Structures are given as structure tokens and as C-alpha cells.
């Protein structure tokens, strides 16, 4: 028997976003000033906590949900939300499950969500708010205007972060060509990449909650975040302290460690250096490093990663690659004459454009 994958809070919020049938039903309930208790899933675990009510098994419609919620009991939907399975049922979850909620409806919703693993929605008629519970987490739905205002402020912050990231990335590229990279230069870029990623996650959650109202915001976010994940991976490939180019497992582990850093540690270059395998002293920040060349070669059009990897493993560093002739590059197994010339020209153009940017 296959294990059933339960939805996450993010997935549940996406199902309740503006433009969805469920959101339409919830807004009708709010306008009608009635409360509601809705279970977004049905199986034997849900059936075990249902008492009374009646079975329906009819196609879901926002108007039907609104009418059924006029009764005191809970409404149970099918797992895919396409059908209304039961109505006017009393939910009887395990009372020993801890909850911080005070209202009877909200306590039942939180306990039912924990016990069944399915999202449970509670609509408060007195406070006129909708709360969704998913496996011990809760989220209060917010109107689109409030989310858009918050998200637009975050977009403005992201734009400033992205501008600063572009500046320090160009500075690092110049230092790489001139062979004068310090650990501090690298950690500055790492920090900025992570800051951009984190605020992007915050905005992305808002976009999910906005549903159809967040289309324009999604386009802005995708444009600002384009290439950020690739840049994070490339800087780990270039500067991980491992003597050999890091494996995929090492890269993922390093990125996971960066993800796990607190906001305070993210501002500490020594904490960032530790993640990359370098000494955590302040003095070490001024030590010089030699990039492997992955990041630089990523700027060469049409160059496949497999070819770049072969060249890095053959020449060791970016400076070794810059000093190599087309013939030297062609001597690497797997690199033909055409690719050797292409890489040689690409590296030369990269060096010229980087220096001219000064």
C-alpha cells in the first residue's frame, strides 16, 4: 500500500488563493456572516472523527459550500476538493491533542488537522477571519490589498539587494581576472546571494497566497531572482575549501548549511567561511584564494557544464585556464578543436570586458 502524501501549509494556502473555487466559497461564507468548519480531505482517518451529519458526494460548488455551512456542523470535501462528501458533521478529534486555541471551532479544527494530516479551515463569524490549520501550523488568510502592499515593499528591498549583489559580483569577477581574490571578497558575494534568496522566499509565499492577483508580482520576482540559485552553486564549486572540485553531495550540503544559518550568522563572515571549510578567524578573511573557473566559464555562451568540468579538473584554477592556449585546451580529453577555440575566445573576451568595466 502506498503512503499518502499529506499537503503542506504552502500547498493548502495555494488551494485557498484568489481565483480558486474554494476561495470563492470562503468569501461567500464571510459575506454571509456565518462561521464554518471545513475539512480538505477524506479517508478512514477523517471518517473516524466524524459524528452525525449526512453523506452527500456531490460536485463541489462555492454556492453549495455556502449553503451547507449555514448549518452548525463541519463540511468534508474529497481530497482533491472536487466533491462535497459530508455535511453537518460533528468533528470529534482526540481531546488530548494539545492546542493553544480558545474557541471551540478553532480547537476542533487544529486537533482534527493534527490527527488526520489534512488541512482544516475554520471561519470565525465574530472576527470575520479565515484560519487554515495544517499539521500543527496555522495561517490566517489576508486580503489581497494588504498582501500586495507588503509584497511591493519587499520587492523594493529585493531590488536594492539585487543592485548591491550585482556590484559585489562584478568586483569579484575583476579580482578573479587580476588574481587577487580574498576570502572576504567571496564571502561578501555569498552573503548577498543568500540575502536575495531569503527575501525572495518571503515574496514567493505572498505570491502563492495572492493566486491570480499575484501574476504581475510573479513576473517581477522571477526577473529579479533569475540565475540566483545557479550563482550560489557556482560560487560553491569555485571556492569550497575541498582540495578537489566539490561533489554534488558536498555542494548540496554546503548550500543546506547556508540555508540553516540564522539571520545574525549571515552577517558574520567568519560563520560563512566555516560553512565553506575555511578558518573562522578574522585574519583569514584577508587570505588570498584562487577560483577554479566554473563561475567565469559559466559566462561563455553555449559552453556545457561537462566541458567546463573537464577543463577545471585539467587546469585546476581560472588563472591556469587564462594562461592556456587553444592547443593546451584541446589537449584535454573530450575537448575538440572547435570547443577549445570557443573557450579560448570566450575567456579572452571575458577578461577584456571585466577589465573594461572598471
From Swiss-Prot:
Gene3D superfamilies for the chain: 5' to 3' exonuclease, C-terminal subdomain, DNA integrity scanning linker region, DNA integrity scanning protein, DisA, N-terminal domain
Family affiliation: Belongs to the DisA family.
A Pfam family that the UniProt record links to this protein: DAC
Organism lineage: Bacteria, Bacillati, Actinomycetota, Actinomycetes, Mycobacteriales
pH dependence: Is more active at pH 8.0 rather than at pH 7.0 or pH 6.0.
Manganese listed as a keyword: yes
Cofactors, names only: Mg(2+); Mn(2+); Co(2+)
Domain free text: The N-terminal catalytic domain contributes to tetramerization and the C-terminal domain provides additional dimerization. Both domains are required for full catalytic activity. The C-terminal domain may play a role in stabilizing the active conformation.
Gene: disA
Top-level taxon of origin: Bacteria
Record-level GO BP terms: DNA repair
Name the record gives this protein: DNA integrity scanning protein DisA
A GO molecular-function annotation: adenylate cyclase activity
Activity regulation info: Diadenylate cyclase activity is inhibited by the interaction with RadA.
Sorted UniProt keywords: ATP-binding, DNA damage, DNA repair, DNA-binding, Magnesium, Manganese, Nucleotide-binding, Nucleotidyltransferase, Transferase
Top enzyme class: transferase
InterPro entries: DisA, DisA_sf, DNA_integrity_DisA_N_sf, DNA_integrity_scan_DisA_link, DNA_integrity_scan_DisA_N, DNA_integrity_scanning_protein, RuvA_2-like
This protein's record includes keyword Transcription regulation: no
Cofactor detail note: Magnesium. Can also use Mn(2+), and, to a lesser extent, Co(2+). Cannot use Ni(2+), Ca(2+) and Fe(2+).
Entry EC number(s): 2.7.7.85
